[in-house]
Amino acid sequence: MRDVVLVTADSVRRDFVDAMPFVAGHEVLTGVTAGNYTRPSLAALQSGRLRAAVESRAIGPTLAEVLGDAGYATIGLVPTAQADPAFGFDAGFDRYDNYMSGGGNPAKNRRSRFREFLGSFDLVRQVYRRVYPMEANMADLPEDAAVIDEAIERFDEADPPRFLWVHLMGSHRPYGTGEDAIPGALDRKAEASGGRHWFGASEVTAEERETILAAYRDALGRVDDEVRRLLRELDGDPAFAFAADHGDEFGEEGYYYHQGYRRRVADPVIRVPVVLDGIDAVGECCSLLDLAPTLAGSQGVETPEPWQGTDLREDTTDETVTVAPWRETATVAWQDFERKLVARDADVSMTEGGETVGVERADVPAEVEAQLRDLGYSDAG
Protein backbone atom coordinates (compact mmCIF):
# COMPACT_ATOMS: atom_id res chain seq x y z
CA MET A 1 0.00 0.00 0.00
CA ARG A 2 1.20 3.47 -0.89
CA ASP A 3 1.63 6.34 1.56
CA VAL A 4 -1.24 8.85 1.52
CA VAL A 5 -0.88 12.59 2.23
CA LEU A 6 -3.96 14.78 2.62
CA VAL A 7 -3.45 18.54 2.86
CA THR A 8 -6.38 20.78 3.66
CA ALA A 9 -6.07 24.55 3.71
CA ASP A 10 -8.39 27.08 5.26
CA SER A 11 -10.59 29.41 3.22
CA VAL A 12 -9.41 28.61 -0.32
CA ARG A 13 -11.93 29.50 -3.03
CA ARG A 14 -12.10 27.47 -6.21
CA ASP A 15 -11.94 30.57 -8.38
CA PHE A 16 -8.76 31.81 -6.69
CA VAL A 17 -6.65 28.67 -7.12
CA ASP A 18 -4.60 30.46 -9.79
CA ALA A 19 -2.87 32.21 -6.86
CA MET A 20 -1.46 28.77 -5.92
CA PRO A 21 0.73 27.79 -8.89
CA PHE A 22 1.89 24.46 -7.45
CA VAL A 23 -1.63 23.29 -6.59
CA ALA A 24 -3.01 24.73 -9.83
CA GLY A 25 -0.35 22.84 -11.77
CA HIS A 26 -2.30 19.64 -11.08
CA GLU A 27 -5.67 18.72 -12.48
CA VAL A 28 -8.03 20.70 -10.25
CA LEU A 29 -11.55 19.46 -9.60
CA THR A 30 -14.38 21.68 -8.42
CA GLY A 31 -15.29 20.43 -4.97
CA VAL A 32 -18.37 21.28 -2.95
CA THR A 33 -18.08 21.21 0.81
CA ALA A 34 -20.58 19.34 2.96
CA GLY A 35 -20.44 22.11 5.59
CA ASN A 36 -20.16 25.89 5.51
CA TYR A 37 -17.25 26.38 7.89
CA THR A 38 -14.31 24.39 9.17
CA ARG A 39 -15.79 22.00 11.72
CA PRO A 40 -18.78 20.57 9.82
CA SER A 41 -16.83 20.56 6.57
CA LEU A 42 -13.75 18.71 7.84
CA ALA A 43 -15.91 16.42 9.97
CA ALA A 44 -17.82 15.33 6.88
CA LEU A 45 -14.63 14.95 4.87
CA GLN A 46 -13.02 12.69 7.47
CA SER A 47 -16.24 10.77 8.13
CA GLY A 48 -17.41 10.36 4.54
CA ARG A 49 -20.93 11.10 5.77
CA LEU A 50 -23.32 14.03 5.60
CA ARG A 51 -24.41 13.24 9.14
CA ALA A 52 -21.05 14.51 10.39
CA ALA A 53 -21.87 17.94 8.95
CA VAL A 54 -25.32 17.87 10.56
CA GLU A 55 -23.78 17.07 13.95
CA SER A 56 -20.63 19.17 13.38
CA ARG A 57 -18.35 16.43 14.63
CA ALA A 58 -16.34 13.56 13.23
CA ILE A 59 -18.24 10.26 13.27
CA GLY A 60 -16.62 6.87 12.99
CA PRO A 61 -15.48 5.03 11.12
CA THR A 62 -13.30 7.95 10.02
CA LEU A 63 -10.73 7.85 7.26
CA ALA A 64 -7.94 7.64 9.84
CA GLU A 65 -9.65 4.74 11.60
CA VAL A 66 -10.15 2.83 8.35
CA LEU A 67 -6.57 3.34 7.17
CA GLY A 68 -5.23 2.61 10.65
CA ASP A 69 -7.10 -0.69 10.75
CA ALA A 70 -5.57 -1.50 7.36
CA GLY A 71 -2.06 -1.10 8.78
CA TYR A 72 -1.28 2.56 8.21
CA ALA A 73 0.61 4.72 10.68
CA THR A 74 -1.67 7.75 11.06
CA ILE A 75 -0.58 11.32 11.78
CA GLY A 76 -2.84 14.38 12.06
CA LEU A 77 -1.53 17.94 12.49
CA VAL A 78 -4.49 20.32 12.41
CA PRO A 79 -3.85 23.69 14.13
CA THR A 80 -7.39 24.89 14.80
CA ALA A 81 -9.83 24.68 17.68
CA GLN A 82 -12.46 23.63 15.16
CA ALA A 83 -10.72 20.24 14.94
CA ASP A 84 -10.39 19.77 18.69
CA PRO A 85 -10.51 16.19 20.03
CA ALA A 86 -13.72 17.25 21.80
CA PHE A 87 -15.31 17.02 18.33
CA GLY A 88 -13.91 13.56 17.62
CA PHE A 89 -11.19 14.57 15.19
CA ASP A 90 -8.44 12.59 16.90
CA ALA A 91 -10.19 9.24 16.31
CA GLY A 92 -7.94 6.76 14.54
CA PHE A 93 -4.76 8.83 14.70
CA ASP A 94 -1.63 7.42 16.30
CA ARG A 95 -0.38 10.97 16.64
CA TYR A 96 -2.81 13.91 16.64
CA ASP A 97 -2.20 17.54 17.54
CA ASN A 98 -4.44 20.55 17.05
CA TYR A 99 -1.96 22.79 18.89
CA MET A 100 -4.49 24.00 21.45
CA SER A 101 -4.02 23.73 25.18
CA GLY A 102 -6.85 22.63 27.43
CA GLY A 103 -8.96 21.13 24.64
CA GLY A 104 -10.53 17.72 24.40
CA ASN A 105 -11.91 17.53 27.94
CA PRO A 106 -15.69 17.84 27.79
CA ALA A 107 -15.95 17.39 31.55
CA LYS A 108 -14.16 20.66 32.29
CA ASN A 109 -15.51 24.20 32.38
CA ARG A 110 -18.76 23.99 30.45
CA ARG A 111 -19.42 27.20 28.63
CA SER A 112 -21.71 29.87 29.94
CA ARG A 113 -25.12 29.88 28.23
CA PHE A 114 -25.36 33.58 29.10
CA ARG A 115 -22.06 34.29 27.36
CA GLU A 116 -23.26 32.26 24.37
CA PHE A 117 -26.43 34.38 24.28
CA LEU A 118 -24.43 37.60 24.37
CA GLY A 119 -22.16 36.36 21.59
CA SER A 120 -25.08 36.27 19.17
CA PHE A 121 -25.30 40.07 19.12
CA ASP A 122 -23.34 42.09 16.56
CA LEU A 123 -22.48 44.75 19.14
CA VAL A 124 -20.89 42.22 21.51
CA ARG A 125 -18.99 40.58 18.66
CA GLN A 126 -17.65 43.92 17.44
CA VAL A 127 -16.55 45.01 20.92
CA TYR A 128 -14.78 41.67 21.37
CA ARG A 129 -12.97 42.02 18.04
CA ARG A 130 -11.79 45.54 18.91
CA VAL A 131 -10.25 44.23 22.13
CA TYR A 132 -8.93 40.99 20.62
CA PRO A 133 -8.07 41.63 16.95
CA MET A 134 -8.04 38.67 14.62
CA GLU A 135 -4.38 39.13 13.72
CA ALA A 136 -3.29 38.80 17.35
CA ASN A 137 -5.32 35.65 17.78
CA MET A 138 -4.02 34.09 14.56
CA ALA A 139 -0.47 34.92 15.65
CA ASP A 140 -0.96 32.54 18.58
CA LEU A 141 -1.19 29.62 16.14
CA PRO A 142 1.97 27.95 14.84
CA GLU A 143 3.08 29.22 11.46
CA ASP A 144 2.40 26.92 8.54
CA ALA A 145 6.14 26.46 8.07
CA ALA A 146 6.45 25.06 11.60
CA VAL A 147 3.52 22.69 11.05
CA ILE A 148 5.10 21.48 7.81
CA ASP A 149 8.44 20.98 9.56
CA GLU A 150 6.77 18.78 12.15
CA ALA A 151 4.77 16.95 9.48
CA ILE A 152 7.94 16.04 7.60
CA GLU A 153 9.64 14.88 10.79
CA ARG A 154 6.69 12.79 12.00
CA PHE A 155 6.10 11.28 8.58
CA ASP A 156 9.72 10.31 8.04
CA GLU A 157 9.97 8.77 11.51
CA ALA A 158 6.93 6.51 10.98
CA ASP A 159 7.04 3.12 9.32
CA PRO A 160 5.19 2.87 6.00
CA PRO A 161 2.50 2.78 4.92
CA ARG A 162 1.73 6.19 6.38
CA PHE A 163 -1.31 8.46 6.32
CA LEU A 164 -0.63 12.13 7.01
CA TRP A 165 -3.29 14.82 7.34
CA VAL A 166 -2.07 18.41 7.58
CA HIS A 167 -4.29 21.49 7.79
CA LEU A 168 -2.80 24.89 6.97
CA MET A 169 -4.19 28.07 8.51
CA GLY A 170 -2.11 30.70 6.73
CA SER A 171 -4.96 31.37 4.29
CA HIS A 172 -7.42 32.22 7.10
CA ARG A 173 -8.30 35.89 7.55
CA PRO A 174 -6.63 38.29 8.15
CA TYR A 175 -4.39 36.46 5.65
CA GLY A 176 -1.13 36.87 7.50
CA THR A 177 0.51 38.52 10.48
CA GLY A 178 2.34 41.81 10.83
CA GLU A 179 2.55 43.75 7.58
CA ASP A 180 1.12 40.80 5.63
CA ALA A 181 -2.21 40.97 7.46
CA ILE A 182 -5.22 43.07 6.54
CA PRO A 183 -5.19 46.19 8.76
CA GLY A 184 -7.24 45.57 11.89
CA ALA A 185 -9.77 48.34 11.28
CA LEU A 186 -10.44 47.10 7.75
CA ASP A 187 -10.72 43.50 8.92
CA ARG A 188 -13.36 44.49 11.50
CA LYS A 189 -15.19 46.59 8.93
CA ALA A 190 -15.33 43.73 6.44
CA GLU A 191 -16.45 41.27 9.11
CA ALA A 192 -19.39 43.53 9.96
CA SER A 193 -20.49 43.91 6.33
CA GLY A 194 -24.00 42.66 5.74
CA GLY A 195 -25.01 43.36 9.33
CA ARG A 196 -25.37 46.33 11.64
CA HIS A 197 -22.07 48.06 12.39
CA TRP A 198 -21.82 49.92 15.69
CA PHE A 199 -18.45 51.64 15.21
CA GLY A 200 -18.52 53.70 12.01
CA ALA A 201 -19.28 52.82 8.40
CA SER A 202 -19.51 49.15 7.46
CA GLU A 203 -19.43 49.47 3.66
CA VAL A 204 -16.11 48.29 2.24
CA THR A 205 -14.92 50.56 -0.56
CA ALA A 206 -13.61 49.26 -3.88
CA GLU A 207 -10.08 50.24 -2.87
CA GLU A 208 -10.41 48.47 0.47
CA ARG A 209 -11.73 45.37 -1.26
CA GLU A 210 -8.63 45.32 -3.46
CA THR A 211 -6.48 45.52 -0.33
CA ILE A 212 -8.28 42.48 1.07
CA LEU A 213 -7.98 40.55 -2.19
CA ALA A 214 -4.28 41.32 -2.51
CA ALA A 215 -3.62 40.07 1.02
CA TYR A 216 -5.68 36.96 0.30
CA ARG A 217 -3.79 36.13 -2.88
CA ASP A 218 -0.47 36.64 -1.13
CA ALA A 219 -1.57 34.30 1.66
CA LEU A 220 -2.60 31.65 -0.86
CA GLY A 221 0.83 31.92 -2.45
CA ARG A 222 2.55 31.32 0.88
CA VAL A 223 0.36 28.30 1.59
CA ASP A 224 1.13 26.98 -1.88
CA ASP A 225 4.86 27.24 -1.16
CA GLU A 226 4.44 25.13 1.98
CA VAL A 227 2.42 22.47 0.16
CA ARG A 228 5.16 22.25 -2.46
CA ARG A 229 7.86 22.01 0.22
CA LEU A 230 6.01 19.27 2.09
CA LEU A 231 5.81 17.04 -0.96
CA ARG A 232 9.36 17.81 -2.03
CA GLU A 233 10.93 16.99 1.34
CA LEU A 234 8.83 14.03 2.49
CA ASP A 235 10.41 10.62 2.36
CA GLY A 236 8.81 8.47 -0.34
CA ASP A 237 6.33 9.09 -3.15
CA PRO A 238 2.88 9.37 -1.57
CA ALA A 239 -0.50 9.65 -3.19
CA PHE A 240 -1.49 13.26 -2.57
CA ALA A 241 -4.82 15.00 -2.10
CA PHE A 242 -5.50 18.68 -1.55
CA ALA A 243 -8.76 20.38 -0.60
CA ALA A 244 -10.05 23.40 1.28
CA ASP A 245 -12.56 23.32 4.11
CA HIS A 246 -14.49 26.25 2.61
CA GLY A 247 -13.92 29.51 0.78
CA ASP A 248 -14.46 33.14 1.74
CA GLU A 249 -16.81 35.82 0.47
CA PHE A 250 -15.52 39.16 -0.72
CA GLY A 251 -18.62 41.31 -0.91
CA GLU A 252 -20.34 39.55 -3.81
CA GLU A 253 -23.61 39.58 -1.86
CA GLY A 254 -22.61 42.14 0.74
CA TYR A 255 -20.76 39.74 3.06
CA TYR A 256 -17.08 39.07 3.69
CA TYR A 257 -15.20 36.01 4.89
CA HIS A 258 -16.93 32.91 6.25
CA GLN A 259 -19.04 33.41 9.36
CA GLY A 260 -20.67 30.24 10.56
CA TYR A 261 -23.50 31.91 12.44
CA ARG A 262 -24.79 33.47 9.20
CA ARG A 263 -25.33 29.97 7.70
CA ARG A 264 -24.19 31.15 4.27
CA VAL A 265 -24.06 28.63 1.40
CA ALA A 266 -23.08 30.97 -1.44
CA ASP A 267 -20.78 29.40 -4.02
CA PRO A 268 -17.73 31.43 -2.90
CA VAL A 269 -18.08 29.73 0.50
CA ILE A 270 -18.78 26.14 -0.55
CA ARG A 271 -16.92 25.69 -3.87
CA VAL A 272 -13.28 24.76 -3.31
CA PRO A 273 -10.37 23.30 -5.28
CA VAL A 274 -9.68 19.56 -5.01
CA VAL A 275 -6.53 17.83 -6.27
CA LEU A 276 -5.93 14.08 -6.46
CA ASP A 277 -2.35 13.35 -7.52
CA GLY A 278 -1.47 9.73 -8.13
CA ILE A 279 -5.16 8.85 -8.30
CA ASP A 280 -7.00 8.82 -11.62
CA ALA A 281 -10.38 10.47 -11.07
CA VAL A 282 -13.25 10.62 -13.52
CA GLY A 283 -15.29 13.79 -13.89
CA GLU A 284 -14.54 17.40 -13.07
CA CYS A 285 -16.71 17.95 -9.98
CA CYS A 286 -17.05 16.26 -6.62
CA SER A 287 -18.27 16.52 -3.06
CA LEU A 288 -15.75 16.54 -0.23
CA LEU A 289 -17.62 13.46 0.97
CA ASP A 290 -15.89 11.67 -1.92
CA LEU A 291 -12.35 12.09 -0.60
CA ALA A 292 -12.44 9.38 2.08
CA PRO A 293 -13.74 6.57 -0.18
CA THR A 294 -11.47 7.67 -3.03
CA LEU A 295 -8.32 7.76 -0.91
CA ALA A 296 -9.06 4.48 0.83
CA GLY A 297 -10.20 2.74 -2.33
CA SER A 298 -7.13 3.86 -4.25
CA GLN A 299 -4.99 1.82 -1.84
CA GLY A 300 -7.15 -1.27 -1.99
CA VAL A 301 -8.70 -0.60 1.42
CA GLU A 302 -12.34 -1.61 1.72
CA THR A 303 -14.62 1.35 2.36
CA PRO A 304 -17.17 1.09 5.18
CA GLU A 305 -20.84 0.76 4.32
CA PRO A 306 -21.86 3.98 6.18
CA TRP A 307 -19.69 6.16 3.94
CA GLN A 308 -21.82 8.07 1.45
CA GLY A 309 -19.22 9.52 -0.87
CA THR A 310 -18.30 8.29 -4.32
CA ASP A 311 -15.01 6.61 -5.21
CA LEU A 312 -14.01 9.09 -7.90
CA ARG A 313 -11.87 6.50 -9.68
CA GLU A 314 -15.04 4.65 -10.59
CA ASP A 315 -17.87 7.15 -10.92
CA THR A 316 -18.77 10.83 -11.01
CA THR A 317 -20.63 12.93 -8.49
CA ASP A 318 -23.47 14.79 -10.15
CA GLU A 319 -25.30 16.17 -7.09
CA THR A 320 -24.13 17.53 -3.75
CA VAL A 321 -25.68 18.61 -0.46
CA THR A 322 -24.21 21.21 1.88
CA VAL A 323 -25.44 21.68 5.46
CA ALA A 324 -24.76 25.00 7.20
CA PRO A 325 -25.53 24.30 10.87
CA TRP A 326 -25.46 26.82 13.70
CA ARG A 327 -27.05 26.10 17.05
CA GLU A 328 -30.44 24.43 16.53
CA THR A 329 -31.09 25.42 12.90
CA ALA A 330 -29.35 25.02 9.55
CA THR A 331 -29.44 26.14 5.96
CA VAL A 332 -29.29 23.30 3.42
CA ALA A 333 -28.19 23.61 -0.22
CA TRP A 334 -28.67 21.00 -2.94
CA GLN A 335 -27.02 21.48 -6.31
CA ASP A 336 -26.19 19.63 -9.52
CA PHE A 337 -23.54 22.18 -10.59
CA GLU A 338 -26.07 23.93 -12.83
CA ARG A 339 -29.05 24.41 -10.50
CA LYS A 340 -29.14 25.10 -6.79
CA LEU A 341 -31.95 24.78 -4.25
CA VAL A 342 -31.54 26.38 -0.82
CA ALA A 343 -33.69 26.02 2.32
CA ARG A 344 -32.66 28.71 4.78
CA ASP A 345 -32.61 28.67 8.58
CA ALA A 346 -34.69 25.52 8.96
CA ASP A 347 -35.14 22.85 11.60
CA VAL A 348 -33.01 20.08 10.10
CA SER A 349 -32.89 16.41 11.03
CA MET A 350 -31.42 13.38 9.29
CA THR A 351 -32.46 9.75 9.56
CA GLU A 352 -29.75 7.17 8.98
CA GLY A 353 -29.98 3.48 9.77
CA GLY A 354 -33.17 3.99 11.75
CA GLU A 355 -31.58 6.71 13.90
CA THR A 356 -32.62 10.35 13.62
CA VAL A 357 -30.19 13.14 14.48
CA GLY A 358 -30.66 16.88 14.30
CA VAL A 359 -28.72 20.12 14.42
CA GLU A 360 -27.98 21.02 18.04
CA ARG A 361 -25.86 23.41 20.02
CA ALA A 362 -22.32 22.21 20.54
CA ASP A 363 -21.43 21.57 24.17
CA VAL A 364 -17.69 21.99 24.59
CA PRO A 365 -15.10 22.98 27.20
CA ALA A 366 -14.82 26.70 27.91
CA GLU A 367 -11.21 26.65 26.68
CA VAL A 368 -12.28 25.35 23.29
CA GLU A 369 -15.05 27.92 22.95
CA ALA A 370 -12.60 30.71 23.80
CA GLN A 371 -10.28 29.46 21.05
CA LEU A 372 -13.19 29.42 18.60
CA ARG A 373 -14.09 33.02 19.47
CA ASP A 374 -10.49 33.96 18.75
CA LEU A 375 -11.02 32.61 15.22
CA GLY A 376 -14.01 34.92 14.74
CA TYR A 377 -16.91 32.72 15.87
CA SER A 378 -19.45 34.09 18.33
CA ASP A 379 -19.44 30.74 20.15
CA ALA A 380 -19.11 27.03 19.39
CA GLY A 381 -22.36 26.97 17.39
What positions do the PLM features span?
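Catalytic domains that recognize anionic headgroups
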Residues: 1-381
